[in-house]
Amino acid sequence: MVTLYSSPSTHSSGPVASYSNSSIGLYNYHHNKQIAVSSILSRKFGSLQINQKPFWNAVRMQDGAVATPPSKIENETPLKKLKNGILPVAPPKEQKDTIDFDSNKAKSTVSITVVGASGDLAKKKIFPALFALYYEGCLPEHFTIFGYARSKMTDAELRNMVSKTLTCRIDKRENCGEKMEQFLERCFYHSGQYDSLENFAELDKKLKEHEAGRFSNRLFYLSIPPNIFINAVRCASLSASSAHGWTRVIVEKPFGRDSESSAALTRSLKQYLNEDQIFRIDHYLGKELVENLSVLRFSNLIFEPLWSRQCIRNVQFIFSEDFGTEGRGGYFDHYGIIRDIMQNHLLQILALFAMETPVSLDAEDIRNEKVKVLRSMRPLQLDDVIIGQYKCHTKGDVTYPGYTDDKTVPKDSLTPTFAAAALFIDNARWDGVPFLMKAGKALHTRSAEIRVQFRHVPGNLYNKNFGSDLDQATNELVIRVQPNEAIYLKINNKVPGLGMRLDRSNLNLLYSARYSKEIPDAYERLLLDAIEGERRLFIRSDELDAAWSLFTPVLKELEDKKIVPEYYPYGSRGPIGAHYLAARYKVRWGDLV
């Protein structure tokens, strides 16, 4: 009897690639299609011919790390071992020619390239987040940051631009100026076109100069419009990817406009990158209260038994901004509020909220459960959608412009700046429970929150104390994502004194009162996760497909039928149609009660 041993494959965030000194073990592990083991056994160890055609240059490991060849080994050595009944594969520590990534970790470097470095997102979010990570000591010892854009700029000019947006944490001001100087010294700039292989090759040369022979890993953050980032991915992959370490690319939304364009975008990305190299970022998944959602649910016994249709009457996901498009009208008009907020931010939060308990906290296990939820949802129907658009409004001496007053927006635009929708999950846990979404611009307040309204108490002894309006007795769990992060539970309580008078009180966890430490920005968490290879908060391609399949039909119907949005004044609570939509399912919007 012959026993073949081989080391298990390694799937870690780092570029670990271990190979046997045995040619047979190597081919059996990485190229088993080239060796028919069964035919070898059937010949009872007759003459053994091994095709040793090199294939190392074609082998690219997870995250783009390139496999390196083992030392040349004569055929008779593994053959003798095979005839003796065992074919061992040496463990990594015994392989002299394999790169020891653990020992090289201290010698490795991370090069971070912000593509589109002169844009608002880079200046306001990405560079400040990178500085915050540096300030907290979260970045690797050896790192370099490069800005890349078409604008002509020197290193000094980039540093001056970036320095204007950097701030130190409120709770840690020590050595702020010194830390800024140290950080800015690591920042450099290279000007080039996004579709130029030559310009990216020049960037690669500069990166290698700063990497100084260290084991290099590279992260590209694409802070550029989606119509040009495929060219940037192609050039970065072909001209500036890491030779031996990992190469990762962060891609900003929007990920297409519908199912078809999103799928085409994914196909284009996968011409140059593996799925493991693509980090589709949705910064709302990096919000503290969103990340805490699974902790709240799965580590507290009082919530998990209630987390189903038996106890929950409806769930509301509410997003509101107190300002209009203001400078982004041209971009926004191409997408609208449903694509900009609902299809990504709110739907991702819904998937985290409604998913089943994952097998583990591993990224793939969590994302598998999210995909199951999305695939269980009914495609959104036009009757379950209300759209609106804000109009000019004068308050006192101040006049606020309407959406179409923006010079970059067509005067006859029907693009919604507000939308409300009712969605349903057809599975055993959530059957019949309405999941309501509401998102809008130029509303009366800025907030993002999750509201869980529980069912009425059957046979409630105190119903008479609430009169005919039983909604006043509804228990409600509120998770306020922004601003002033908080979790509070609305309960019914007796008012102190004689008699029996009830009111609703809040059991309140206000983060600013409970925790003295400032909450990190979402971009800090997501950038750190990308550097460490943690994919839990990033969107997988099948998640994206499932999400678009829910919204694409209704988006097409809205545009084909040229549905006119309901107009609402700038600074108001939104169109009245949203109330009628909620009332159809016997629900009141919790933020308007």
Swiss-Prot record:
GO terms for cellular component: chloroplast. NADP(+) 2 binds at residues 438, 451, 480, 488-490, 573. It comes from the Eukaryota. Pfam families: G6PD_C, G6PD_N. InterPro entries: G6P_DH (IPR001282), G6P_DH_AS (IPR019796), G6P_DH_C (IPR022675), G6P_DH_NAD-bd (IPR022674), NAD(P)-bd_dom_sf (IPR036291). One of its GO terms (biological process) is pentose-phosphate shunt, oxidative branch. The active site is at 345 (proton acceptor). D-glucose 6-phosphate binds at residues 253, 283-287, 321, 340, 441, 446, 482. NADP(+) 1 binds at residues 116-123, 150, 253. SUPFAM superfamilies: Glyceraldehyde-3-phosphate dehydrogenase-like, C-terminal domain, NAD(P)-binding Rossmann-fold domains. Regulated by metabolites. Post-translationally inactivated by cysteine-mediated redox modification via the ferredoxin-thioredoxin system in the light and this avoids futile cycles with photosynthetic CO2 fixation. It catalyses: D-glucose 6-phosphate + NADP(+) = 6-phospho-D-glucono-1,5-lactone + NADPH + H(+). Pathway: Carbohydrate degradation; pentose phosphate pathway; D-ribulose 5-phosphate from D-glucose 6-phosphate (oxidative stage): step 1/3. Its EC number is 1.1.1.49. Its main location: plastid. It is found in: Plastid, Chloroplast. It is an enzyme of class 1 (oxidoreductase). GO terms for molecular function: glucose-6-phosphate dehydrogenase activity; NADP binding. Keywords: Carbohydrate metabolism, Chloroplast, Disulfide bond, Glucose metabolism, NADP, Oxidoreductase, Plastid, Transit peptide. PROSITE patterns: G6P_DEHYDROGENASE (PS00069). Belongs to the glucose-6-phosphate dehydrogenase family. Catalyzes the rate-limiting step of the oxidative pentose-phosphate pathway, which represents a route for the dissimilation of carbohydrates besides glycolysis. The main function of this enzyme is to provide reducing power (NADPH) and pentose phosphates for fatty acid and nucleic acid synthesis which are involved in membrane synthesis and cell division. Homodimer. This is Glucose-6-phosphate 1-dehydrogenase, chloroplastic. It comes from Nicotiana tabacum. The lineage of its organism: Eukaryota, Viridiplantae, Streptophyta, Embryophyta, Tracheophyta.
